[in-house]
């Protein structure tokens, strides 16, 4: 019997073997090509063959200890050899057989076994390690364990740090990439991301407005040329005149200037060491719309009508609303565009911006006529029955309709038709769009109301701006603040303010706060100060920028309430206190400083009560309305912030337990019945 292991391999031997080819081991020398395909099986006991061509043969060798002595003592003993006589080239079939019998180099290399071993070891131990830090997640180590829906486990601090690095969002598993539960993704949201969700509601984009007529030559550019009478005597030519305006043109240019006036009273509101602060009312009036021949064509307007169709507008008030809308439609021209929005317990846009052609006017009348008494609009798909919705949401939608339009007319306006009180109609102070409120509770003659509507639609001044300054003989004063008194009080600026567009003969009131040094002369008389006003606007009829000459206005002598018996002084002081408090509180609300705004409003109300005003006074009622609005806004903000639980160790532990239970339930439902008993193996 042969001892040891036998190894079979292929090699090449020469056809003729010489005695010199016999090696010391008693084996025939192997001579084959140096490019042998299986050279990696060569060992020190298997000698290399010389260069030459030979046939491939299969031989068997027994490596025993006695083989050496036998071959050395008996040189003529025949060798144990097994030859296969084949051709010099192997067939593909033989090659495939050899490749199957021969193991690959990669499978027997130590590096491959090490890599395979490490992979198997990672798969076995990955279920007990954190998928982020790769540390143990065994219980009892004092660290909360988070189990995802895909059954991967993590340390809870690792998950929170990973979410913080991704802006507090963890949408997928860090190991397998599967999506997590919605409550996991939305669990830790900062307060800065909650605020836009409260403010910005899901408002659609209103860019479906009807296109304007685009013609190369605008009809507004034509001016009628007056024909002279043939029988009229021809005047003699007197030469060319340079820049000689006609009397009609000069009168039109003079009438197109903005009128600015100051009130005859000025009240001191604060005084200190070396200075005093007083306020004065300024009234700005736009010029009338020109009615001369060639100037009668007004600028096209984009109008949004906001209709209050709540339950309170039933019966006669609803008919008044319809009649008012018919008057508005009759004053619109073909180039004007109209959109209708109705609101009650909810708001909806009933029609997009459409040109008031014959079809557009007919469609608008049909929408107005189908408004029923209970407040529901048939065929529109919205129920307007109910109470309690603020008009502010409808105004925001109206402003959005004008902001999202694709093509724009040079003038825009919003009409609000309602019977609510003045403090219930919210004016958007930050919007440049003029908002006009039409009270349905006041009976106005139809002809007077038509003139008012026509005046609202006639743009007289576009993009009006004022530059204010103080000129004094004995001391230089300064304008500290300018507040708007038309509509909702708002802070406009200091010296340079912007009033925007104004319709024909529109008048706006401004409250100007001035700070100047005190005159310490022996006479004690205050020096008269002069206010300079520089206006700048665009003429809507010609689209020319106009810069009229500066105006000098004499500021009245400021007086205190104690030194004057004029009731207008005390009224002006109270107006300054309430207006300043409301305007500054809104600036604080925009910065989310609710406590400071509430403190400012309550202190102003206490000061007015101390001055002797009753609760029925307009200033007190305005402050009460602002305090109520502030409390409602603050309540919504607090409710939204408290809806999300603060992230504490206790809440984090509870959240982790809740999510782990959900993951285990889903895992139990998806368990394969054939693997019963292996559900904890986490396949």
UniProtKB/Swiss-Prot annotation:
Catalytic activity: S-ubiquitinyl-[E2 ubiquitin-conjugating enzyme]-L-cysteine + [acceptor protein]-L-lysine = [E2 ubiquitin-conjugating enzyme]-L-cysteine + N(6)-ubiquitinyl-[acceptor protein]-L-lysine
UniProt EC number: 2.3.2.27
Keyword check for DNA repair: no
Alphabetical keyword list: Metal-binding, Transferase, Ubl conjugation pathway, Zinc, Zinc-finger
Gene3D superfamilies: von Willebrand factor, type A domain (3.40.50.410), Zinc/RING finger domain, C3HC4 (zinc finger) (3.30.40.10)
Main EC class the enzyme belongs to: transferase
GO biological process: gravitropism; protein ubiquitination; root development
SUPFAM superfamilies, alphabetized: RING/U-box, vWA-like
GO molecular function terms listed in the Swiss-Prot or TrEMBL record: ubiquitin protein ligase activity; zinc ion binding
SMART domains to which the protein is assigned, alphabetical: RING (SM00184), VWA (SM00327)
Zinc fingers, RING-type class: 130-176
Tissues showing expression: Expressed in root tips and leaf primordia.
Pfam family, one: zf-RING_11
Origin: domain of life: Eukaryota
Domain VWFA: 302-438
Key word DNA repair present: no
Function noted in UniProt: E3 ubiquitin-protein ligase involved in the regulation of root growth. Acts as a positive regulator of root gravitropism. Possesses E3 protein ligase activity in vitro.
UniProt xrefs under PANTHER family: CALCIUM-ACTIVATED CHLORIDE CHANNEL REGULATOR (PTHR10579), E3 UBIQUITIN-PROTEIN LIGASE WAVH1 (PTHR10579:SF165)
Descriptive protein name: E3 ubiquitin-protein ligase WAVH1
